[in-house]
Amino acid sequence: MALLGLTLLALAPASNASAQLLAAKDGPIVYGHHHLNVTNLDEAKTFWVDAIGGVLIKVGPENREIIKFPNALILLRAQKPTAGSKGSTVDHIGFSVKNLRQVVDRIKAGGFRMVTSAEAPPNVKVQDDIGIVEAGPVSGIAYAMAPDETKVELVEMKAQAAPIASHHLHFFGMNKEMQAWYMQTFGASTLDSANPAAFISASLPGLTMNFSPSQAPVAGTQGRAIDHIGFEVRNLEAFTKKLEAQGIKLAAPYRQVPALGISIAFITDPWGTYIELTEGLDKIN
């Protein structure tokens, strides 16, 4: 089945998944979902649900499974990816957690790899798979490899209420140009970086976007472990016309899906990141 078809079926209105896009009320464009290609669905669900704490729900007439977190959904496509997330424009996805030690221990107990020592910024000291952070709301960071070499960062924020929530996307490539493009295209705001030596940042309601320079060429996302990222957009049809007027070509045209109460379109950023745009994802119930 085509990826577009899988996306639509996965979003069929048979659950309260919309309750997870908590930031949708806070701006015209917010983050919506990660769409992953996975070799083994059961192994993927073990990581995203049992190990890190997502909630598995079944939606639509065919009981399609998606995984929900506050401020993001994860959609899984049963297809072996062409490569992992490292080496692509979207190096990893990030979640904030209330108790990092517990999550790291569950990941290891599930047989998945912690890669904090290899992946943490060089100015972060690592002890027992956790990078020590001693200032601000973040008290620790860790990195894990989900199935199919999907890189995941976990940021400990002890003050948050939820055990886990969507936190950030981390792009690699032409970082200054990328930051400027996402700010101009999606109305993201500039944000002080949590680690200025390693990356620059921008933000949308419910999402931080970090941008690191890459010494090596990076590839686009489509077909890889993180196939595409998704933004929820108010007045999507008008937004797609605005994009076209700005010279941004639609990879798939605006389309209404009345049976699901949503609209969709796709674009690709200048560096190859495949992006789905949705309207109505925040209202599906």
Where do the model's predicted regions map?
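Bacterial N-terminal signal peptides
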Residues: 2-13
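Vicinal oxygen chelate
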Residues: 18-26, 29-40, 65-66, 83-171, 192-196, 200-203, ...
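Short, glycine- and small/hydrophobic-rich beta-strand elements in well-ordered beta-sheets
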Residues: 21-22, 64-69, 76, 80-83, ...
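Mature N-terminal segment immediately following signal peptide/propeptide cleavage
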Residues: 25-61, 65-67
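Short, structured motif recognition centered on aromatic/hydrophobic residues
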Residues: 31-38, 54, 74-76, 90, ...
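Conserved active-site tyrosine of GNAT-family acetyltransferases
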Residues: 44-49, 107, 149, 178-183, ...
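Conserved acetyl-CoA-binding loop of GNAT-fold acetyltransferases
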Residues: 50-56, 112-113, 184-191, 246-249
